[in-house]
Amino acid sequence: MNYRMQIQYDGARYRGWQRQAATGDTIQGKLEAILTRRFGRNIEIDGASRTDAGVHALAQIANFHVADDEAVEPEELQKYINQYLPEDIAVTGVVAAGERFHSRLNATGKTYEYHLIPYGTYDVFVRKYAWQMTEPLDIEAMREAAGHVLGS
C-alpha cells in the first residue's frame, strides 16, 4: 500500500525537511518516527521537495509504502499521525495512492512564495513569516536581473 500525504508546517524550529543523522529536528524525521512507531518497523518517507531550515510549507506532498497486510484506512492514519505531531506540523490529508506514485518524481509543479515587508513599514503580525527590508527595493535592478533568468 502506498500512501500520499499532504503536510503543512511552520519550519521556524526545524532544520528543514530532510532527515539528518545528527538531529531529529526535521519534518521528515518527526513524521518517520511516528510512522515507525505505528507500524513497528522503519518507515521511510519520500517528499516532493526539500525545504531548508526555517522554511515553511503549506502543502508539501510526501508518500510512503507499507505491506498490504499493514494497511489501515487513510483517515485513521491521518488522525494517528496528527495526534503525535507537534502543533507546528499537521498532516492535512492522507489518501491511498497507486503503487507507482512517487511524490518527487510525479510532481508537476512547485510554487515558492517570498514575503517582504517594505522598507519603512512594519507589521508585527507577519514578522516571523516575512523578511523586513532594510532599504528600499531597486525595482529597475530587479527587472534587469530577472531578464537574465527569464525562461530558464
Model-derived segments and spans:
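Structured-RNA-binding interfaces characteristic of tRNA pseudouridine synthases
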Residues: 1-152
